Amino acid sequence: MSRARTLARKRAVQALYMWEMTKVDLSDIDQQFVLEHDMSKVDLKYFQELLHKIPAHIDVIDDHIHTYLDRPFSEIDPVERAIMRLGVYELQYRPDVPYRVVINEAVEIAKVFGAEDGYKYVNSILDATAKKLRAAELKARKSS
């Protein structure tokens, strides 16, 4: 897995959190991150895709997440919401990224930025979502 992509995901989670908390324009957040953070080792194109396309597809993404929640969406930690949204986006719109990579990356980001055991919840939601969105990929993996 690409270190530059991992860094893009981490920065995207931070930027999506900022967007949700402040509702600042995405272009301004994008510009701020490029100017104020070390983005030299980040896959900038992927960061920008995540930052701009996740909000563009937020209703579809959130519908997938809502399907598996055991509590109101508003009670989910905002950082963990951002991580779940990133994971669901990749599961839905980036079939080139293997589902295991999506889940592993999200879990690792949740361990760094989320609440103490938040990564377990992120894992369970993304695992359930992957079973729905990537059923053929999971089936192929089991039969090989």
Located regions from the model:
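N-terminal interaction/assembly modules
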Residues: M1-S144
